[in-house]
Amino acid sequence: GYAKSVGVNVLDYKYFTNKDSVKVDMFPVILKPVKLGSSIGVSIVKNQEELSYALDVAFEFDDAIIIEPFISGVKEYNLAGTKVNGEFIFSIIEEPQKAEFLDFDKKYLDFSRTSKAKEVDLGDKLNLEIKESFKNLYNTLFEGSIIRCDFFVIDNKVYLNEINSIPGSMANYLFSDFQELFTKVASNLPTKKDIPINFEYVNKIQVAKGK
């Protein structure tokens, strides 16, 4: 995968398409559509009986999935950032206070969160490792954008959980002055590149949500 190719740790995972026979040897696991985000189609599967339904849900949104071990109580840390004129600008590192799992509605339709995030200090070594992992993930692929990376720390080792582009990257509560940051990025965008636009997955989401 991309993260491993740039030297960033990830949890062991298995990749399946909708044509594969999916086998899980140990539970619990977390099951995710490959090309989506925002917890759409994601399930925590605690036993074999729950697996078939979770697969049906995920394959409504995508034709490929990944399955990872689900580690209850693992520490997760969020870092957002961008690069302007060759220099990285980082948010604070936040440890989100949350329930076991946040679905799409809780992430984007729950407006109860109004305060700024509280910064967490993990010590120089882990703070640096998280930022270096972010840089490795950002360089070349995300030039000119703001992204948020969510990391796990397990036994003092940093692992990537996921990379969030829009809308998850717009974590304005992580920055002291998000408007100023946004203006800097908008004023220093790289040379325009032609990006193919494909609404295939938007259409899949609409169809699946309507069922």
Residue ranges: model-predicted function:
Residues 1-73, 131:
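Active-site nucleotide/adenylate-binding loops and adjacent lid/helix of ATP-dependent enzymes
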Residues 8, 143-144, 178-180:
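Helix N-cap/coil-helix junction residues
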Residues 38-39, 115-116, 169-173:
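Short small-residue beta-strand/loop micro-motif enriched in glycine and branched aliphatics
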Residues 46-125, 153, 158-159:
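Phosphate-binding site of ATP-dependent enzymes
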Residues 52-59, 105, 130-138, 182-186:
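A generic alpha-helix structural signal
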Residues 112-121, 127-147:
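Internal helical hairpin/lid segments
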Residues 138-165:
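C-terminal hydrophobic structural anchor segments
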Residues 157-211:
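C-terminal active-site "lid" helix and adjoining low-complexity regulatory extension at the edge
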